[in-house]
């Protein structure tokens, strides 16, 4: 079976490996090299690096909307196109090119969390489970019928990065299962998504990373987890802007103004919130690296309870 794979970030690499394990991946589509690092030199995507290492031809069009790019895809004569976090819109004409259409690996239990950031939004919302769907793509945003799915519990300690890695591996397994069925001549049953329960996972914005102490401590703790490793939550701590890599919510009544330092010890720095308190465990000062609360307190001798 001739497969064209389209993906860009690290999340898609496991799925590319799964597709290449028992099938012929005739080409990989990925976004053009982008500026990265302090030198802003052009850097290849993780998917491109994996494809090159495997000797798979790589295509990097800026868009798939023009006829030349679509003809290039037709010339590959794909039986199936697998799309995993590609980042470019696939026009209807492209969806119709492969014999079996286009499959997408999506990191949520559709129709919940359609869109760009399903992993982080699930944590932020306090969901107790998520999963992966293998979807038959259509013109709408993540609206296609689901072929296979697999659930995954969300641990109360999961960060965005940790859940990302778990779902990347789960996505590869679900894709492998689907490809195995197709190879055996069995096309998975396409089940339309329910009309109820649709939510959208909008793209992350750095502005969202600024914590407002007026909010509930539980919600703030979930934001800290969801936004690690990017964009990393930040807040004002006794007059200093800090980034917060690790924190837990405390269910306690305090009667203090939001943002007040309630306690400070090696275990963490407790900050009054609109409801409860947030214990900061891992912080980062401007221009510095992530450090424990104990190390932060050693560096900030001026920090006082009640500030």
UniProtKB/Swiss-Prot annotation:
A GO molecular function term, named singly, is:
methionyl-tRNA formyltransferase activity
Q: What is its EC number?
A: 2.1.2.9
Q: NAD: present as a keyword of the record?
A: no
Keywords annotated in UniProt: Protein biosynthesis, Transferase
Residue positions annotated to bind (6S)-5,6,7,8-tetrahydrofolate are 108-111
Per the UniProt entry, the disulfide pairs are none
Give a Pfam family name: Formyl_trans_N
Q: Which GO terms describe its cellular component?
A: cytosol
Describe the reaction catalysed, as an equation: L-methionyl-tRNA(fMet) + (6R)-10-formyltetrahydrofolate = N-formyl-L-methionyl-tRNA(fMet) + (6S)-5,6,7,8-tetrahydrofolate + H(+)
Superkingdom per UniProt: Bacteria
Q: Show the NCBIfam families listed in the entry.
A: fmt
According to its UniProt entry, what is the function of this protein? Answer: Attaches a formyl group to the free amino group of methionyl-tRNA(fMet). The formyl group appears to play a dual role in the initiator identity of N-formylmethionyl-tRNA by promoting its recognition by IF2 and preventing the misappropriation of this tRNA by the elongation apparatus.
Similarity field:
Belongs to the Fmt family.
- Its protein name is Methionyl-tRNA formyltransferase
Species this chain originates from: Stenotrophomonas maltophilia (strain R551-3)
């Amino acid at each position: 079976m001739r497969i064209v794979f389209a993906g860009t970030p690290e999340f898609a690499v496991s799925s590319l490996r799964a597709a290449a394990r028992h099938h012929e991946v005739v080409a990989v589509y990925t976004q053009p090299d982008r500026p990265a690092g302090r030198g802003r030199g052009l850097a290849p995507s993780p998917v491109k690096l994996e494809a090159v290492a495997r000797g798979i031809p790589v295509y990097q069009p800026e868009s798939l909307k023009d006829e030349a790019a679509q003809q290039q895809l037709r010339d590959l004569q794909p039986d199936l196109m697998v799309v995993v976090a590609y980042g470019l819109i696939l026009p209807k004409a492209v969806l119709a090119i492969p014999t079996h259409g286009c499959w997408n690996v999506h990191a949520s239990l559709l129709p919940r969390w359609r869109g760009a950031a399903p992993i982080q939004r699930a944590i932020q919302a306090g969901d107790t489970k998520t999963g992966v769907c293998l979807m038959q793509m259509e013109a709408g945003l993540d609206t296609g019928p689901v072929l296979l799915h697999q659930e995954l519990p969300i641990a109360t300690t999961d960060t965005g990065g940790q859940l990302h890695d778990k779902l990347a591996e789960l996505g590869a397994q679900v894709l492998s299962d689907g490809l195995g069925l197709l190879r055996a001549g069995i096309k998975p049953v396409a089940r339309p998504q329910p009309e109820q329960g649709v939510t959208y996972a909008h793209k992350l914005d750095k502005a969202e990373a600024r914590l407002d102490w007026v909010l509930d401590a539980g919600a703030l703790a979930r934001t800290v987890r969801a936004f690690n490793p990017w964009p990393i939550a930040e807040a004002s701590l006794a007059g200093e802007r800090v980034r917060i890599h690790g924190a837990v919510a405390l269910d306690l009544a305090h009667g203090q103004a939001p943002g007040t330092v309630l306690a400070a010890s090696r275990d963490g720095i407790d900050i009054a919130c609109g409801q409860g308190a947030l214990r900061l465990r891992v912080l980062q000062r401007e221009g510095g690296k992530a450090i424990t609360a104990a190390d932060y307190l050693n560096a900030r001798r001026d920090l006082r309870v009640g500030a």
